[in-house]
């Protein structure tokens, strides 16, 4: 059974999308494409893995950061994990509260991510923020948000290192 906070967060992002239209039309659904030899997927929130265990079209892969869901590139919106529903954004949990940022990893595949949050529907951004606030109230989900924050900080630091400057989310 999914944690209540996760059920509520998923519900908030069930219908709303980054653009008023299908953003996959902009890039050919680049975020849902897999490439031979690569096991790319989405990091699941605590409790989500059970939804996909044994489901056709989905593979669960353990990683040092948690469970990654790899799909075949097509699924119904109702079956998408929370990370897909909020893509290309990421929820961060800083000492001063919840923050919403463009996922540093998304910039490699998503033209909207390269544009930043201002290119997205502000209703979508607000819904992601509301979902993050719900998750931050749950200890297990808050710990996951802190891990996501650390991962984003590492990606930003690595990028800054190669650009020769210090950068923060």
What is each of the regions a protein language model found here?
Residues 1-169:
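Short loop/turn segments that flank or connect secondary-structure elements
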């Amino acid at each position: 059974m999914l944690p209540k906070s996760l059920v509520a967060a998923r519900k908030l992002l069930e219908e709303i999308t980054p653009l008023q239209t299908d953003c996959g039309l902009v890039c050919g659904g680049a975020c849902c494409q897999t490439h031979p030899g690569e096991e790319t997927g989405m990091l699941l929130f605590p409790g989500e893995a059970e939804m996909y265990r044994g489901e056709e079209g989905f593979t669960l892969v353990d990683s040092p950061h948690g469970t990654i869901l790899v799909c075949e590139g097509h699924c119904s919106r109702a079956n998408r994990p929370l990370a897909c529903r909020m893509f290309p954004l990421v929820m961060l949990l800083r000492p001063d509260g919840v923050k919403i940022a463009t996922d540093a990893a998304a910039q490699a595949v998503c033209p909207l991510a390269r544009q930043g949050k201002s290119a997205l529907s502000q209703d979508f951004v607000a819904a992601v923020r509301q979902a993050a606030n719900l998750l931050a109230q749950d200890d297990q989900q808050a710990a996951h948000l802190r891990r996501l924050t650390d991962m984003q900080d590492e990606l930003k630091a690595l990028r800054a290192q190669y650009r020769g400057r210090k950068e923060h989310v």
